[in-house]
């Protein structure tokens, strides 16, 4: 069982398409992003109110520097690419008022996976606060998912 929140959720999704041990029967992700580049572009726009120009070329330059320094482009850090290879059951959880990792990203992630999947949007929850805002509903969704797919 893999379970992650925020960056941990993105990490869980990024491992989903790998050759994981058979003990990993299912994955739960809570508010993970689609890929690093999309998240940085979103933050530049929302936090810094940066317009498309110069945001686009700056993120591309940053991606190139990242490639030189650590060996990969920002787009390579992609949950979506790994989810295309996933065949394990997944529960996707996201806050409906998430401004840090926009809620729209969960729909892209959800559509990308090949395994059995469930989606729960915690309507009024901001980033990483679905459990804090809806503890009973959160527990119910997780418990039902685990009962279905993890024996």
Model-flagged regions — what are they?
Residues 14-72:
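Hydrolase active-site cap/lid region
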Residues 79, 88, 102-111:
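Short alpha-helix in the alpha/beta-hydrolase fold that links the catalytic acid
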Residues 96-101, 128-129:
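Acidic catalytic loop of the alpha/beta-hydrolase fold
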Residues 4-8, 12:
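Gly/Ala-rich beta-loop-alpha elbow adjacent to hydrolase catalytic centers
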Residues 65-82, 88:
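Active-site nucleophile elbow and catalytic-triad environment of alpha/beta-hydrolase enzymes
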Residues 85-86, 92-94, 98:
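Short beta-strand/loop motif that positions the catalytic acidic residue
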Residues 133-151:
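Catalytic active-site module of serine/aspartate enzymes centered on a nucleophile-bearing elbow/loop
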Residues 110-128:
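Catalytic histidine neighborhood in serine/cysteine hydrolases
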């Amino acid at each position: 069982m893999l379970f992650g929140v925020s960056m941990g959720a993105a990490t869980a999704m990024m491992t989903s398409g790998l050759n994981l041990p058979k003990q990993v029967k299912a994955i739960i992700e809570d508010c993970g992003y689609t890929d690093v580049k999309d998240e940085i572009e979103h933050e530049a726009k929302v936090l810094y109110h940066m317009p498309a120009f110069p945001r686009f070329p700056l993120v591309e330059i940053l991606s190139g520097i990242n490639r030189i320094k650590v060996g990969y482009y920002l787009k390579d850090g992609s949950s979506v690419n790994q989810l295309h290879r996933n065949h394990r059951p997944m529960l996707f959880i996201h806050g409906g008022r998430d401004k840090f990792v926009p809620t729209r990203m969960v729909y892209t992630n959800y559509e990308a996976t090949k395994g059995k999947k469930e989606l729960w949007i915690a309507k009024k929850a901001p980033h990483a606060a679905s459990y804090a805002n809806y503890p009973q509903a959160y527990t119910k969704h997780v418990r039902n998912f685990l009962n279905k797919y993890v024996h």
